[in-house]
Amino acid sequence: ISACLVGSEMCIRDSKDTVFAKETGGSLDLTLNLVAMLRLMNPNAMIPATTAVGTIDPRGREKAILSGANVVMPNLSPVSVRKNYMLYDNKLCTGDEAAECRKCLDARIRSIGYEIVTDRGDYREF
Protein backbone atom coordinates (compact mmCIF):
# COMPACT_ATOMS: atom_id res chain seq x y z
CA ILE A 1 0.00 0.00 0.00
CA SER A 2 1.58 3.26 -1.06
CA ALA A 3 -0.97 5.66 0.44
CA CYS A 4 -3.78 5.59 3.01
CA LEU A 5 -6.29 8.26 3.95
CA VAL A 6 -8.29 8.67 7.15
CA GLY A 7 -10.45 11.68 7.79
CA SER A 8 -13.48 11.56 5.54
CA GLU A 9 -15.80 10.49 8.35
CA MET A 10 -15.03 13.81 10.02
CA CYS A 11 -15.72 15.84 6.89
CA ILE A 12 -19.36 14.90 6.84
CA ARG A 13 -20.05 16.58 10.18
CA ASP A 14 -22.26 19.60 9.53
CA SER A 15 -21.74 19.39 5.77
CA LYS A 16 -25.08 20.85 4.79
CA ASP A 17 -24.75 20.07 1.08
CA THR A 18 -24.18 16.31 1.39
CA VAL A 19 -26.40 13.30 1.96
CA PHE A 20 -24.60 12.95 5.30
CA ALA A 21 -25.71 16.36 6.60
CA LYS A 22 -27.76 14.88 9.45
CA GLU A 23 -25.27 12.17 10.37
CA THR A 24 -22.90 12.38 13.30
CA GLY A 25 -19.28 12.80 12.28
CA GLY A 26 -16.42 10.72 13.60
CA SER A 27 -14.16 11.88 16.38
CA LEU A 28 -10.66 13.29 16.19
CA ASP A 29 -9.44 10.66 18.67
CA LEU A 30 -10.77 7.83 16.51
CA THR A 31 -9.14 9.34 13.44
CA LEU A 32 -5.78 9.75 15.20
CA ASN A 33 -5.95 6.16 16.44
CA LEU A 34 -6.65 4.97 12.90
CA VAL A 35 -3.72 7.02 11.56
CA ALA A 36 -1.45 5.42 14.17
CA MET A 37 -2.69 1.92 13.31
CA LEU A 38 -2.18 2.55 9.60
CA ARG A 39 1.36 3.72 10.26
CA LEU A 40 2.15 0.58 12.26
CA MET A 41 0.67 -1.62 9.54
CA ASN A 42 2.21 0.33 6.63
CA PRO A 43 5.51 1.89 7.72
CA ASN A 44 6.36 3.23 4.24
CA ALA A 45 2.92 4.53 3.24
CA MET A 46 2.08 8.14 2.57
CA ILE A 47 -0.58 9.09 5.13
CA PRO A 48 -1.89 12.66 4.98
CA ALA A 49 -2.65 14.95 7.88
CA THR A 50 -5.79 16.27 6.22
CA THR A 51 -7.33 19.71 6.34
CA ALA A 52 -10.37 17.96 7.86
CA VAL A 53 -8.49 17.19 11.08
CA GLY A 54 -7.22 20.77 11.11
CA THR A 55 -10.78 22.01 10.70
CA ILE A 56 -12.08 19.92 13.60
CA ASP A 57 -9.20 20.84 15.94
CA PRO A 58 -6.91 23.89 15.64
CA ARG A 59 -3.89 21.58 16.13
CA GLY A 60 -5.42 18.63 14.32
CA ARG A 61 -2.85 18.38 11.55
CA GLU A 62 -0.02 18.53 14.06
CA LYS A 63 -1.70 15.79 16.11
CA ALA A 64 -2.08 13.69 12.97
CA ILE A 65 1.63 14.09 12.14
CA LEU A 66 2.52 13.06 15.69
CA SER A 67 0.18 10.06 15.32
CA GLY A 68 1.90 8.82 12.16
CA ALA A 69 0.82 10.96 9.21
CA ASN A 70 3.66 12.12 6.98
CA VAL A 71 2.01 14.24 4.28
CA VAL A 72 0.40 17.69 4.39
CA MET A 73 -1.44 19.21 1.47
CA PRO A 74 -1.62 23.01 1.51
CA ASN A 75 -4.42 24.65 -0.43
CA LEU A 76 -2.63 26.28 -3.37
CA SER A 77 -5.67 27.07 -5.50
CA PRO A 78 -6.46 30.75 -6.07
CA VAL A 79 -8.70 32.09 -3.31
CA SER A 80 -11.25 33.20 -5.91
CA VAL A 81 -12.06 29.61 -6.97
CA ARG A 82 -11.94 27.77 -3.64
CA LYS A 83 -15.62 28.35 -2.95
CA ASN A 84 -16.39 26.19 -5.99
CA TYR A 85 -15.21 23.00 -4.34
CA MET A 86 -15.98 23.24 -0.64
CA LEU A 87 -16.14 19.58 0.36
CA TYR A 88 -17.35 20.45 3.84
CA ASP A 89 -18.25 23.53 5.85
CA ASN A 90 -15.69 25.71 7.65
CA LYS A 91 -12.77 24.19 5.74
CA LEU A 92 -9.36 25.24 7.00
CA CYS A 93 -7.29 27.89 5.15
CA THR A 94 -9.89 28.80 2.54
CA GLY A 95 -9.20 32.53 2.82
CA ASP A 96 -5.40 32.44 2.91
CA GLU A 97 -3.28 33.11 -0.16
CA ALA A 98 -1.00 30.19 -1.06
CA ALA A 99 2.12 31.91 0.32
CA GLU A 100 0.35 32.67 3.62
CA CYS A 101 -0.86 29.09 3.89
CA ARG A 102 2.63 27.74 3.23
CA LYS A 103 4.21 30.06 5.81
CA CYS A 104 1.62 29.14 8.46
CA LEU A 105 1.89 25.43 7.71
CA ASP A 106 5.69 25.56 7.83
CA ALA A 107 5.59 27.21 11.28
CA ARG A 108 3.08 24.67 12.55
CA ILE A 109 5.15 21.70 11.39
CA ARG A 110 8.34 23.20 12.85
CA SER A 111 6.52 23.68 16.19
CA ILE A 112 6.37 19.88 16.57
CA GLY A 113 9.96 19.28 15.54
CA TYR A 114 9.52 18.46 11.85
CA GLU A 115 10.12 20.32 8.61
CA ILE A 116 8.32 20.39 5.30
CA VAL A 117 10.13 18.81 2.38
CA THR A 118 9.05 20.03 -1.04
CA ASP A 119 10.40 17.30 -3.28
CA ARG A 120 8.03 15.21 -5.38
CA GLY A 121 7.11 12.94 -2.52
CA ASP A 122 6.88 9.80 -4.59
CA TYR A 123 6.26 6.57 -2.71
CA ARG A 124 9.51 4.75 -2.05
CA GLU A 125 10.00 1.19 -0.96
CA PHE A 126 12.73 1.10 1.63
Regions found by a protein language model. Give the residues of each.
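Single conserved hydrophobic/aromatic residue that forms the stacking wall/gate
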Residues: 1-7, 11-12
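Auxiliary Fe-S-binding modules of radical SAM enzymes
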Residues: 12-126
